Design a protein with these regions (language model features):
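Alpha-helical DNA-contacting segments of helix-turn-helix folds
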Residues: 51-58, 65
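Hydrophobic alpha-helical segments that form the core
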Residues: 138-143
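Helix-turn-helix
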Residues: 7, 11, 15-49, 53
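N-terminal intrinsically disordered/low-complexity leader segments
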Residues: 1-3
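Amphipathic alpha-helical packing segments from all-alpha helical-bundle domains
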Residues: 77, 110-135
Length: 143
C-alpha cells in the first residue's frame, strides 16, 4: 500500500471513529489527510470502498491485538484475558463503541459488503471465544 493510500485509510479510520460514518464525507477525509480528491479516488473508488477498507484494516488489527493479549492462555484463563482486553479497550479515552456495529447501524441494506464485513467480524469473535468455552474447567481444575 502506498503512503498516500495508508494516510487516507488512517485518516478515514480516525474520523469515522471520532464522528460517524454518515457524518464524515470524502471532502473532510481529503482535507484532513492532505491529499487531493483525485488521489483519494485513485485508491478508493467511492466512500463505501473506503469504509470497507477501514473495516478490513480494523479487523486485522483487532484480531492481532486480541490474539497477542490472550497469548498461550487456555480455557477460563483465555476467556478472562478476552474480557480484560475488552475492558482496557472500553476504558480508552477515544473509545466510541465498536466500529463494526456502528458501520452496520449506519449502512443501508444495499451496503452488502459493509454489512458482511461487520457480520464476519462478529462471527470470528464468537468463534474465538467459543473455542475456549468448550472445556472451561480444563485449566482451572488443574490448579
Amino acid at each position: 500500500m502506498s503512503k498516500s493510500a495508508a494516510k487516507i485509510l488512517s485518516t478515514a479510520e480516525q474520523l469515522f471513529n471520532q464522528h460517524s460514518f454518515n457524518a464524515v464525507g470524502v471532502d473532510l477525509i481529503r482535507d484532513e489527510s492532505g491529499c487531493s480528491k483525485t488521489t483519494l479516488y485513485t485508491y478508493f473508488k467511492n466512500k463505501q470502498q473506503l469504509v470497507a477498507s477501514v473495516l478490513k484494516k480494523r479487523d486485522i488489527q483487532f484480531r492481532q491485538s486480541l490474539c497477542d493479549f490472550v497469548g498461550e492462555a487456555q480455557s477460563l484463563a483465555a476467556i478472562e484475558q478476552i474480557f480484560d482486553w475488552h475492558v482496557m479497550w472500553f476504558q480508552q479515552d477515544h473509545f466510541k463503541g465498536c466500529l463494526f456495529v456502528r458501520a452496520a447501524g449506519e449502512s443501508s441494506q444495499q451496503d452488502t459488503e459493509i454489512l458482511n464485513l461487520a457480520k464476519q467480524h462478529k462471527h470470528w469473535l464468537y468463534e474465538f471465544i467459543a473455542q475456549y468455552a468448550q472445556h472451561p474447567q480444563a485449566t482451572s481444575s488443574s490448579h
